[in-house]
């Protein structure tokens, strides 16, 4: 009955939501079995982003455990959980969390989450958690009731920014850094993904991002941990070692790869896609250098974007063609395979999974799920109307989505139906075995073939072969090079090939090693592209070529002149 009662700001559990009482949790009760788990480092990882509430029909930590063996068999190595901090309403993406230490009660208890992580480690999978340290949600945020010092007058597009460098900011920094330690120590997380770091403001001698990375790396008592981040301005400094003037994060999301891929596959160049053409050179440059914009003018923002990436390891760029934001930003939540041809989608998937960066798949992508991923967030009526209005205004940057006809089709974010539509239909796993088999084979090739496993940008080069076709050559010291040919256009014939990257190693010829046109994947078959009359690359396909021995020439039946 006392209106001045508030939840504990460091509550470990809110069983009745962010407005209810805080439950005392003993973190020592759970019996871990992952004592031999040594953690993860970024090289060699395959990340899988999932939302607990829509990953299974039940939408719980416990039910998600049953899918871990499938992820392992597919070739996934790290599960990335969308934010779990307690938020208001019965469903939401999680980016409006308010109780940073309390895993959402909607998905189970804190020990249920521990059981999920423990099971993942037993299966051979790492787990990292998406955390939001740039703002807190609009409903259920009681931190100001304890101190106004948590926030600053600086604004983000989602609300007040966190005070990491202003008056009385030291306890604020300690609060958030203790949250970093909490997830890694008490839940055995293998690292964190930091949301929208461009909206984390700090002028301290040690930037809070560097402090977060340092804390995360030191918190695991000998286990290896990783810290990845979203950084829209593409500041490569975040992923440089501290002794080189960087912040010491392990990897950054690479929006450039996604934007070029979407333009190439759909032809749409609206809003923040307008600076990308989807041309072959963009993919060659992405494979060699990571970010495409490294200080050039970015017309969409009317200013330079990005910083040079020289010296940043290739595994520090997280590449994707789908994630939660980009699928939802299509307006109707359609998956990318639904917006292009099957051949082109297979070819782009091959590039994603064989390029030197760290690939990320979004839930259901491995079996071409038909479930959309829409923006959903349940709030009280007035706030729900404001959220829906804000979503419409955000999508209005895309002219095709700003028409009255399209606006009328937008799902209501606060509707339970919108949320339920996003749940994966796991019966599609059996129906779409061709798509799944291709992902499995690609990840096996990436893992077992030395050329792809190396993730070495210094040992890769590329060439444009046509308006929609290009090659990447992966160099190995023993001349066991690999050629990845990607053709997003029609059949391409090259009678002459004055391109040295097409030349096989000495005394070798090229043999077809792998193709997206394998009938096992739904393709139409692939003749050897290197013919007596030149090269012939099938349209809408990707091929991997490996050196093979030359066939001995048949003896000349006419003999030789004496």
Predicted regions and their residues:
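Carbohydrate-interacting/catalytic domains
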Residues: 1-48, 57, 65-74, 334, ...
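Short, flexible loop/turn elements at secondary-structure junctions
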Residues: 51-56, 85, 104, 133, ...
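Active-site proximal loops enriched in glycine and acidic residues that flank catalytic Cys/His/Asp
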Residues: 83, 104, 130-131, 166, ...
């Amino acid at each position: 009955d006392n209106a001045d009662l508030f939840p504990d700001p460091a509550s470990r559990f809110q069983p009745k939501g962010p407005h209810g009482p805080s439950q005392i949790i003993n973190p020592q009760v759970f019996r871990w079995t992952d004592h031999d788990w040594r953690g993860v480092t970024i090289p060699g990882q395959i990340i899988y982003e999932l939302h607990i509430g829509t990953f299974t029909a039940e939408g719980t930590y416990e039910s998600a455990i049953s899918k871990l063996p499938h992820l392992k068999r597919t070739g996934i190595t790290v599960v990335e959980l969308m934010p779990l901090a307690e938020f208001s309403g019965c469903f939401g993406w999680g980016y409006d969390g308010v109780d940073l230490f309390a895993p959402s009660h909607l998905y189970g208890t804190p020990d249920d989450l521990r059981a999920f992580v423990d099971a993942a480690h037993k299966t051979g999978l790492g787990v990292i958690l998406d955390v939001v340290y740039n703002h807190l949600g609009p409903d259920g945020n009681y931190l100001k009731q304890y101190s106004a010092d948590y926030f600053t007058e600086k604004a983000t597009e989602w609300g007040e920014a966190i005070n990491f460098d202003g008056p009385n900011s030291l306890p604020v920094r300690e609060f958030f850094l203790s949250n970093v330690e909490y997830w890694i120590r008490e839940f055995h997380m293998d690292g964190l993904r930091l949301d929208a770091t461009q909206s984390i403001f700090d002028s301290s001698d040690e930037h809070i991002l560097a402090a977060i990375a340092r804390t995360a790396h030191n918190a695991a008592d000998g286990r290896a941990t990783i810290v990845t981040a979203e950084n829209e301005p593409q500041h490569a400094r975040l992923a440089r070692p501290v002794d080189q003037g960087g912040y010491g994060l392990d990897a950054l999301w690479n929006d450039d790869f996604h934007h070029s891929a979407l333009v190439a596959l759909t032809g749409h160049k609206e809003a923040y896609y307008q600076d990308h053409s989807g041309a072959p050179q963009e993919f060659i440059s992405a494979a060699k250098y990571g970010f495409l914009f490294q200080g050039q003018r970015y017309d969409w923002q009317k200013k330079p974007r990005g910083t040079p990436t020289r010296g940043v390891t290739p595994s520090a760029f997280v590449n994707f063609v789908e994630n939660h934001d980009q699928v939802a930003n299509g307006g109707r939540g359609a998956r990318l395979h639904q917006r292009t041809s099957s051949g082109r989608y297979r070819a782009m998937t091959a590039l994603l999974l064989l390029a030197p960066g760290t690939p990320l798949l979004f839930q259901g992508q491995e079996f071409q799920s038909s479930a959309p991923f829409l923006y959903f967030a349940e709030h009280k009526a007035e706030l729900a109307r404001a959220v829906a209005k804000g979503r419409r205004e955000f999508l209005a940057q895309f002219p095709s989505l700003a028409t009255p006809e399209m606006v009328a089709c937008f799902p209501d974010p606060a509707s339970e139906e919108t949320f339920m539509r996003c749940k994966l239909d796991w019966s599609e796993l059996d129906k779409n075995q061709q798509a799944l088999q291709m992902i499995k084979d690609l990840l096996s090739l990436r893992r077992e073939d030395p050329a792809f496993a190396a993730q070495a940008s210094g040992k890769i080069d590329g060439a444009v072969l046509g308006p929609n076709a290009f090659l990447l050559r992966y160099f190995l010291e023993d001349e066991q090079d690999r050629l990845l040919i990607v053709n997003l256009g029609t059949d391409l014939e090259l009678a002459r090939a004055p391109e040295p990257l097409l030349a096989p190693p000495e005394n070798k010829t090229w043999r077809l090693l792998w193709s997206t046109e394998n009938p096992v994947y739904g393709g139409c078959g692939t003749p050897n592209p290197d013919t007596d009359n030149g090269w012939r690359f099938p349209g809408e396909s990707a091929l991997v070529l490996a050196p093979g021995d030359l066939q001995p020439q048949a003896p000349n039946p006419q003999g030789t002149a004496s």
